[in-house]
Amino acid sequence: MGSRPIARGRSAEVFADGEDRVVKLAFPGVDAAEVAQEVAASRLAHELGITPVRCHGGVEVDGRHGIVFDRIDGIPLTAVAERNILRLPQVGSTLATEHLFVHRAHTDRLPDVREIAVAQLDTPALSALTPVERDAVARRIRALPAGDAVLHLDFHPQNVFVLAERNVVIDWQTAVAGQPAADVALTRLLFREAELFPGTSAPMRVVYGAVRRILLRFYLRSYLRAGTVSVADLDRWEIAARVLRLGLLDIPSERARMIAGIRADLAAV
């Protein structure tokens, strides 16, 4: 395994492991159960045909838990947009096409997105909500419709890679089952409100904000055109999307905004 990472995210680093494989090493503090969950979800995604990337199981390196995957030779959709800004509409549409492809897969082997969302209400990230508010949010989420489509829950251009033969979706650690509208609502929320990487300058935040708005417009236009999800569906899942975003990631700079959004969603009923 290489000594320097070839990619880095919020929770893990990726290292080359020979020519054909990579090791995704979680940062210290990520427990073995979380990694085991990602192994199971990644293997299921491959089994269902929604990713060609094979998962070769878990490893431990210097006390850090990790996973061995096939190495893919491609670039993320974000890089496509960065190389040619005129391709932003195409990138947004491609993102929708790949999301629809994921949602055509169905399973009874993943947890229900509604129960995962309700479970987040007991995490420290959601502690700003009062007990009465948490109960109200839980009732709202449990009243949402059931489903068995595969949902990704972290679907954005950096998790879709463009290869010569096809596009590939990566990072299945948050995969669940449910209504596709839940997943699309999370992607919409990510484009609208998610924090950019720390250290991004004010001028670049303006640029990235404009890019996000363009990508979101073409992503939603393409996804909604399929007719399986409506804007009203996305709005109904908005409160669950905020709970999932905050509970699963707990990004400090997003806490106040997500809590305020949850309260606004409750008040809008």
Question: Language-model segments: which ranges?
Answer:
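Acidic active-site catalytic centers that drive phospho-/nucleotidyl reactions
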Residues: 24, 38, 154, 171, ...
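Hydrophobic "anchor" residues on beta-strands that sit immediately upstream
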Residues: 20, 66, 148-150, 167-168, ...
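Hydrophobic residue at the +6 position relative to the catalytic HRD Asp in the kinase catalytic loop
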Residues: 158-162
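ATP-binding pocket architecture of kinase catalytic cores
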Residues: 4-111, 145
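An alpha-helical support segment within catalytic cores of ATP-dependent transferases
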Residues: 104-153, 163-164, 168
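Active-site Asp-x-Gly
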Residues: 166-212
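Helix-rich C-terminal or lid/interface subdomains of diverse kinases
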Residues: 191, 198-269
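Short, glycine/acidic-enriched loop or turn micro-motifs at the edges of active sites
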Residues: 73, 155-157, 174-175, 186
